UniProtKB/Swiss-Prot annotation:
Pfam families: Beta-lactamase2 (PF13354). It comes from Streptomyces lavendulae. This is Beta-lactamase. SUPFAM superfamilies: beta-lactamase/transpeptidase-like (SSF56601). Predicted to be exported by the Tat system. The position of the signal peptide cleavage has not been experimentally proven. GO terms for molecular function: beta-lactamase activity.
Length: 305
């Protein structure tokens, strides 16, 4: 899994993302699995991981340099959980902001709203409760710290969860749907259709947002910058990927041990890899399985790196 070369700088990654959009790198994934050279047993290893961890594992990974893909349960629905926050922020940037004016708008909220959201590490700080927060800071909190109250405030400005579904449809994603607010959207019952996506759908959408032209260049750079600054992936993608692969991602978790990570990673000196790992269980008492996500990321890096 070792990779030589210096880890790309944040500026280099943002520049490369802009270049990918201009170059029109194909992001939509092939329906066939192309076994990476030297590692024909990737699917077998993914099935073994699934059995080892008694989980349902969904995978979409696409090497934008070669078009090679790794797909496992890529068309099955999984609870989305906080992975949706990237979509909500992207919708705010595209549909509500004009030249940064809306991002500078200060929103006010109550302590009860933070408590009701279930998780507010940034919105719940006394100084933010007193003074409110700008939309720009709420976007950063929603992605970088996965702040639920920040996400709910953004959803409120958008007009509710269904606005995220409409946004997905507008960028070609006919699968991903958001129906509820935080924290109810994380209930993750097996078989539920609401608040779900598939590995292929969310992977293609993340790719369009970060590497495609779904957003204006300035908005794409902002969104990518927040994904690069994410703090919640330490035990998930970040632990499984080589240290010199730059990572911009968003995690998510909920009931039934649901544990997700989705984003884009930049190996040194080469185009990026879009990567999605979605996991869940059929037991309500199951706990989030970070090692499964990290091991899957390591396997994908080895296969496509």
């Amino acid at each position: 899994m070792g990779t030589t070369g210096a880890r790309p700088s944040r500026r280099a990654v943002l520049t490369a993302a802009a270049g990918a959009a201009v170059a029109g790198i194909p992001l939509g994934g092939s329906t066939a699995f192309a076994a990476p050279r030297g590692n024909p047993d990737v699917l077998r290893q993914l099935r073994a991981l699934e059995q080892e961890h008694s989980a349902r594992l969904g995978v979409y990974a696409r090497d934008t340099a070669t078009g090679r893909t790794v797909l496992h349960r890529a068309e099955e629905r999984f609870p989305m959980c906080s992975v949706f926050k990237t979509l909500a922020v992207a919708a705010v940037l595209r549909d509500l902001d004009r030249d940064g004016e809306f991002l500078a708008t200060r929103l006010f909220y109550t302590e009860q709203e933070v408590k009701d959201s279930g998780f507010g590490p940034v919105t719940g700080l006394p100084e933010n409760l007193a003074a409110g927060m700008t939309v720009e800071r709420l976007c950063a909190a929603a992605i970088c710290q996965s702040d639920n109250a920040a996400a709910n405030l953004l959803l409120r400005e958008l007009g509710g969860p269904e606005a995220v579904t409409r946004f997905c449809r507008s960028v070609g994603d006919r699968t991903t749907r958001l129906d509820r607010w935080e924290p109810e959207l994380n209930s993750a019952e097996p078989g539920r259709l609401t608040d779900t996506t598939t590995p292929r759908a969310i992977g293609a959408t993340y790719g369009e947002l970060v590497l495609g032209d779904a957003l204006a260049p300035r908005d794409r750079e902002r969104l990518t910058g927040w994904l690069l600054a994410n703090t919640t992936s330490t035990e998930r993608f970040r632990k499984g990927l080589p240290a010199d692969w730059t990572l911009g991602d968003k995690t998510g978790g909920g009931a039934y041990g649901t544990n997700n990570d989705a984003g884009v990673t930049w190996p040194p000196h080469r185009p990026p890899v879009v990567m999605v790992v979605l996991t869940t269980h059929d037991r309500p008492d199951a706990v989030a399985d970070n090692p499964l996500v990290a091991k899957t990321a390591a396997l994908l890096a080895s296969a496509l790196g």
